[in-house]
UniProtKB/Swiss-Prot annotation:
CDD domains referenced in this protein's UniProt entry, alphabetically: Ribosomal_L10
Listed SUPFAM superfamilies: Ribosomal protein L10-like
Keywords: Ribonucleoprotein, Ribosomal protein, RNA-binding, rRNA-binding
Functional summary from the UniProt entry: Forms part of the ribosomal stalk, playing a central role in the interaction of the ribosome with GTP-bound translation factors.
Subunit and interaction comment: Part of the ribosomal stalk of the 50S ribosomal subunit. The N-terminus interacts with L11 and the large rRNA to form the base of the stalk. The C-terminus forms an elongated spine to which L12 dimers bind in a sequential fashion forming a multimeric L10(L12)X complex.
GO molecular function, one term: large ribosomal subunit rRNA binding
Top-level taxon of origin: Bacteria
GO biological process: translation
InterPro entries noted in UniProt: Ribosomal_uL10, Ribosomal_uL10-like_sf, Ribosomal_uL10_bac, Ribosomal_uL10_bac_type
Protein name: Large ribosomal subunit protein uL10
Family listed: Belongs to the universal ribosomal protein uL10 family.
Pfam family, one: Ribosomal_L10
Entry's Gene Ontology cellular component terms: ribonucleoprotein complex; ribosome
Length: 161
């Protein structure tokens, strides 16, 4: 049984994790085996995602005065909380891939930029491009625009002759 001091330590740790998070994903862990949970934790470490199972009351106290305080009324039942630190869609990607292999898990909702994202719209968060993907897309757009301009100039020169 947790005493008051232990609970306060848990709340402060979760609060620190929450404040450094870009997004939070809440999942119903019912039906996940311990081996599957270990695999989830391994894959989450690679993408800088913390996965925690915290008592609902302690989680409600931990999110007070953070950008995730809108979650308070949704923290009910059995929950697995995933905190994304480096990219807002990391946790969503991990669990979307996991649900393809395991139908037992259910993504409840996510929070990104103080907005609740329901399970039906989780793809929005999971498909957000990473920083590297955004840079590559931007470079490709610039290259395409440059090539199109060069072709137009060559056509104009050819037409003027």
């Amino acid at each position: 049984m947790l005493n008051r001091k232990n609970k306060e330590n848990i709340i402060s740790k979760i609060n620190k994790i929450t404040k450094s998070s870009l997004s939070i994903l809440i999942v119903d862990p019912t039906g996940i085996t311990s081996n599957q949970m270990n695999n989830l934790r391994k894959s989450s470490r690679k993408l800088n995602v913390n996965i925690k199972q915290v008592r609902n009351t302690l989680m409600r106290f931990a999110i007070v005065d953070t950008e995730f305080d809108c979650l308070e009324k949704y923290i009910k039942g059995s929950n697995l909380i995933a905190f994304s630190h480096s990219h807002p869609g990391s946790a969503a990607r991990i669990f979307k891939n996991f649900t393809k292999e395991n139908n037992k898990i259910k993504i409840k909702l996510a929070v990104f930029e103080r907005k609740i994202i329901t399970d039906s719209n989780i793809d929005y968060l999971a498909n957000l491009p990473t920083h590297e993907e955004s840079v590559i897309n931007f470079i490709n757009i610039i290259q395409e625009a440059s090539i199109k301009k060069l072709i137009r100039i060559l056509i104009l020169i050819n037409n003027n002759k």
